[in-house]
Structure formats: C-alpha cells, structure tokens
C-alpha cells in the first residue's frame, strides 16, 4: 500500500539521521554479499517496524539485498524478504504467537516444487542500548534492551534515548534447503526450523545482554524441588530429628546464601562506574586474544577459569567481557566476600557464593550442585577461580578441583550444550593489595576480609597501578577431554549424581590443562622483567647499563624462542623498561661518577618476588641450561639433556609448564640454539658441547644472571634430597621430611638473606616429596617411612651437577645442624 510504504520510508529516513548501529561481527556484511546468487531472507528475532527500518538502512548503506523487497516470485505470489519469529498475537493481546511464520511455510513449499531454488536465511537481532563500549546513564538504563517484547511507547523511547548505542547482530547465512528433512509437511518443517532459530536467538540474547531473570523464583523453586535436594532434606530430618518445615527452611537458607541476584540495570550502571575507576587506577586495561571469546561464545556453555591475583579480578574480567558485547558471567565467589554492602552488590553483578568446604554437609552440597546445574542448564556463562584463593606468592597455586568436578558431573548428567573452559591470565604491573601481600609474604598471618578493608582500600584511588593485561588462553572443550579419557563409552557407569571412578581422572587432567593454559597466556610487563633481573643480584642493585642489557637479552630470548603464541611481551626496550620502572616508583637511582646504579628498597624487593613469580615459568628452561654452567665451563649436549630430563618433571609440576617429557629434547635444542645466537653460549660442533663466555665478558654476567632465575628452585630440591640422605633410608615420614625441610630453608633464609619467601614454603616441599613418591624415586615402607635406592642417588648427583660447591656446602652444613637439633 502506498501509505504504508510512505510511512516506512519516513521512519527509515528519520532513523538514518539518528541511529548509528554497530554491526557484529564486522565481516557480516561481506558474508551476506558473498551469497547473493541465491535469494536472501532476513530472519528477525522480533517483529518491529523500527528494527526492520534499521536493517533496511544498513542494507542500503552496504549495498545488500533490501529486507523490504520480495523474493521467489512476483507481486502477490512473492514472499517477503524479512520474516519475524517473535510477535504478539494482536495489538491488545501481548501473548507471544509461536506459530511458524506463513512466509516461511510458503518458502518451503516453493523449494519443494522446484529443486533448483534455494534461499539463504540470515538471522538478524537488534539490541537497542547494548553497544558495550559506551558509558551508561540513568535514562539509558531505564530503556535498555531486555527480554520482554517492547511496547510501541517503549520502542520509541529506546530509539530516542539509545539510538546511538545500538548493536545489530548478523548471523551466518544458512541454506534453507539444507535444513529440510525428507519427510514432513511444509508447516511442520517450518515449525521445527522456527523453534531452532528461536532457541539460537535466545542463546545469542543471553550471551549479549545476560540471562532472562523473569524466572529466578522458578529456578530457586526447581532447585528445592529436585530429587537429590529432597533426599538430602530427608536425611537431614532423620539425622537431626527436624520437622519437614524446618528442614525446608534450612535448605532455603542455604540457597539464599548461595544464589546470585543478577540485575541488568546494576550491570549497566557498573560499566560506567568501573570505566571511570579503571581510568583513575590504571593506565589502561588491555584485553588480548578477544577473538577466542567470539569463537566459543555461541552455542556453548562457557566456563571462565582465570588465575586469581587480586580482588580486582572479579570486576576486571566481568568488565572486559561486557565491553566485548557479552553478558557478565555468574561468578563463584568465596563466602568471605559476602560481607555487608559488598556482598549485595556482588550478587547483583552475578556473583553466587560458595563455602570453602562442603565436608559433612550433604544438604548444602545437594543445594549447591543443583543450583549450579540450573544456571548451566539455562545457558549462563559461569566463572570461578580454580586456585581457590588469591595467590600470595605470584605463582599459580595447585588447583582445587571441587568446582571443576561439579561442572563435569553436571554436564555428564544433562549434556544439553557443549562445555568449554576458557582460561584467563591477569597481568598486573602493581596490585592494589601490595601492602597486605608484603606483610603476608614476610610471614604475617592472612587477615579476614571486612568492611573496614573496603574503606581502607579507597585510599589507593590516589595512586597509580600501571597497565593491566587480561589475556585469554587456549580454550579446552570438555568433550575433547572426555573422549581422550574414554568417557563417552563409560557414561553407563555414572550414578544419578554423575559420579564414577573414572570421573576423577577427567577432573584432574582438566585441572592441570587449565593451569598450563593460563600460564601459556602470560603477559610480560616491564615490572616482570625488572623483577627477574634485579632479584638475581645479591643486593638487588645493578649498573644501569647492565640492567638495560639484561632486560634486552630477556626480551630477545622471549621473541626468538617464544614459550607460546599467546604470551604477550612489552614493546619497550631495555632503557625504556628502566624509565618505566622509575615512573612506577619501583626503582631508585643512585648517581655515581662511573655510571648510575639502579636499586630497589628492601620492601620492594619482597614485593618484586611476586612479579617475578608471575613469569618465572617462561624463563625456567633457559635458566636451567644456564645453571649447568655455574660450575662448568664446557657441558656436553647429552649432559644438558639428561639434567633437563631429570629435573623437568618437578619444575613442570610446580610451575605448570606446557611441554610433555617427549617434547623436551626438541625444546632444549631450540633454546640452546637461541642462546648461542644471542652470544651467551658458544657451540662446539665437534664435541657436541657448549662453552660459556670468558669470565670477564658482559655475556658471562648475563649467563650467570639467567641462571639465578631457577637456581633457588634447584637449591630447594637439593635441600630436600640432602635432608633425606643425611637422615638415611627409612628414617623419616613424608610429613617429618617436609617439616624438617621447611625449618632448614627458614634458617638458610635468615643466614643468606634471600628475598624469596616461597623458598621456605611448606607447600613447595610437600609437592616435591609427593612427586618423588609418585615417580617411584622414593617409596614408603610398611611403617610409612621413606626409603630410597640408587635411583634417588642419581637424582642427587644431577642436582649437585648444577650447584656451585659453595652452595652445596652451605646447604649440607645447615642440614647437618638442623638434623642435630632434631635428634
């Protein structure tokens, strides 16, 4: 009708003056252009004249087929080139009409009559007020995109207020003929295709604006009605002699303690607030490998598994995900953060709370498991920290597998969508908890969080914390891990809670992969380089020229022999790294006629161990090679390879290194070649050996400093070995050995003044002893005491090979003193 066309044209011209949509993905229009040989039909998520006009303007601007046209015929027999899926039944009837669009039925009828014709369906979703890179306002919050079908008035307000903050999501063109089955009427085929498209739009909308919260009470009711929860309630009633109502109230109390209270309005408000906060605290937030997120977000249940450095981790990851155009994930937060004011805000931001331990509380376990299963079933992305708590040392902690286990079991019970784990690495140049961490690194007990901590934290708003790097690691599809572990063939062994003996192996494997992939996405900042270099010096002081030269060496090594393609490295050169360290107040300069010296304070030296440990895994193998030359001027390749083979399993377990033992020889050869090219080793071809530089050369100093990155790790291993050897086979239990090693390490720390608190960390010794047992280097006798044989003595000999005589003598001397004190 001419009147309708005139109104549509007027609406389109009005929108063209005001609306500035962002198109996602950027390559979408070229993908549509590539399939114009077939008729194109745009499938809109919702019926809206405004949405259609916005799409029309986009197509005109990009030279694409227009949605206002017709396809598959002429005049009355033609089909509209745009069909909406969700539409109200009438002007005064807001209920959704779920019948398949008549145009879709007619298209299928045409395709069935003529086998030479095909139609390309292009899904289109328009989000008014969901362009994530723009800051929010209260008016925009009121009329931002949500899950309800908008009334005419609301749509008008959305256009007026959010017109410049609009996103058009264009799906991949798909052949309609490829979606048809051999049997079924056109109406049934259309209904099936429409259902699938609506489901895809729901998943896409959840990924973009967050979950549909209109059914939160339904989710909570479903959790409390679950058979496993009811069974746990019955056990609670029986064991504690509680009436049914009281047991129900206990379960409901647990659920209220756990559950998030996700708010779209709060999320949008926090985007603007956090944007201003980051600008005040940081010099920028860099999000690397964002394309990975785009690849996995659609049609998968995404589980973000970041490392845990700071309380800022919660906010930063949610912020960068939201800025990429995706919904904020539901975050598993420790119950210690459920404090007044803060806890309420975190719930509105998607946090659900988890106790440190479920032991002995079957009802709480059942409620939590069912809540996790419910939010996963609804397609919400989730996030949790597999380390359990924040790392105080800068190293990745050994993973806690509880949440991973519950995620795996939930998927095994109800595998609705593929699950993919997305590791995330946080690289801070300075952490806001620096003062607290220095105290804890120096031996002070960990403090419990309180509202007072929040007030004290406001003081940091006056300080600068450099740049933050958020790097996305290689995703890990759960189905891939299950297949490798033979899980697909063993699902019949699962009980109704998803438990089976083989599931533990899957969980452990998955946990280790996550930690390795986090480390494989590390960010190397100027502060990391300064920490690795200066902590190698006894007094944390160097000539400026030597410091710049060493930083340059590390930068070249990281680029010539990269640890992983996802590792990011600062673009600064050595001199600029020093200047940056001074601007961050990390370095102190001492002027001298023979050349300036650069140093750090004692307190800063303790904190720098944190930043060194963030990237220590990147330097471990090159440093291990350098260790071989501490007491040897020439070393054969086979001796270096044997040393690496002997030590690698222990450093790989401690630092979550990425390579298998089978890959190790090739990795060591590449590193040796890189070190030779950098001039700090000389290749002796005829002897198949390597020679260190002349002792008086700058390269000799560089090699010695590189060795220091891992020498304390080797010293710690040798300390444990020497302690056990001195005590004798069958003399100590694993616990007694660990305690004695810790005391000895503390004494060495006091005598030699190491600025390395983790050197005497009991957990490090526990992990090393446990790995010695698993690898059968030592064994437990019938009394539970440790016994060893020639294999252990060969490990000890290799440890001696890389340590200087002075270091070995010092360790043996302190070990003997400690042994006498214990006897």
Language-model regions, residue ranges each:
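Membrane-interfacial terminal anchoring regions of lipid-handling membrane enzymes
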Residues: 1-823
